[in-house]
Amino acid sequence: DRRQRQMCIRDSMWTEVCNKPEEVEYLIFPRLAAVAEGAWTFPVYKDWDRFLAALDNFTGHLDVKGITYARSMYNIQHKVTPMDGSLQVELECIRPDVEIRYTTNGSQPTAKSSLYERKWQVTTPQIIKSATFKNGKQMGQTLTLPIQWNKATAKRMLRSNPVERVMVNGVRGSLKYTDSEWASWTRNDSIAFTLDLRKREHLNKLVLGCINNYGMGVHKPKRVEVWLSNEDIEYWKVASKELDPEEIFREGTFIEELPFNLDDTGRYVRVILFGAGECPLTHVRPGQEARVCVDELIIE
């Protein structure tokens, strides 16, 4: 058993993105307590509730010492899932000792707002705001979920990777491509996904939301094609777009939309993405395959 031969545990902290001591403290604490828990506590004694009680005692000492630490353990994780015409909203926090309060009209949640008890269905555009509370005090950051609605929202993706369902859940991604709202793929040379609108409709426009993260090698595809069908058998191409390397491998982190004029009628919409290939030699990640990330498929 390798665990019996393990002599120690080590955690690493890279500071190239830190500009002052407070930022280092924020990234170290209270994560360092979790490292110590993993290193010094025998498996038989590991218990989440016991650890939280000890952690609260530890952060109390950090408060007295004026140390800046992350309070992300009080933040809310969300999942908005298409469910055949509606969206299922699920909220959770890793701490079981807090209440989740939420609103659906865009107002700031308070200790008297609706108590989250179970996931619920959404069928209209709305702005959901939620936060954790303990003894009437807000503990974490407010989570804002603006749910938008278009012809693609909550519709069924055919023969798709489950991660692609985020493209029709009405929630846009942030500048953090790991925020669970960006669909990404293991292979990026050719990506295809098909949406069932459930009936033939006249389609004016399709928009694809993409993110550019130069440091991580995430870029727009070099070519996009949009195809339509009435029976999911024969498809015809209605729009396409080609991008040159200068337009693809741009520096910075930003979100960019790729619009396509359709002006056609169909039930099934197929989008084919062709990845940009390897990052050029002048790139910060030369030779690495460029990744494609899409947050939303918008059809008007």
Can you name each region flagged by the protein language model?
Residues 1-5, 9:
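Single conserved hydrophobic/aromatic residue that forms the stacking wall/gate
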Residues 10-17:
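Active-site clefts of carbohydrate-active enzymes
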Residues 19-24, 44, 282-283:
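Short conserved micro-motifs at the rims of enzyme active sites and ligand-binding pockets
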Residues 28-29:
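Catalytic cores of enzyme domains
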Residues 32:
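Conserved, mostly hydrophobic/aromatic
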Residues 42, 46-194, 207, 211, ...:
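Short, compositionally stereotyped local motifs that mark structural "simplifiers"
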Residues 177-237, 252-300:
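Aromatic, loop-rich ligand-recognition surfaces of beta-strand-rich domains
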Residues 237-248:
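Solvent-exposed serine/threonine-rich low-complexity stretches and specific carbohydrate-binding patches
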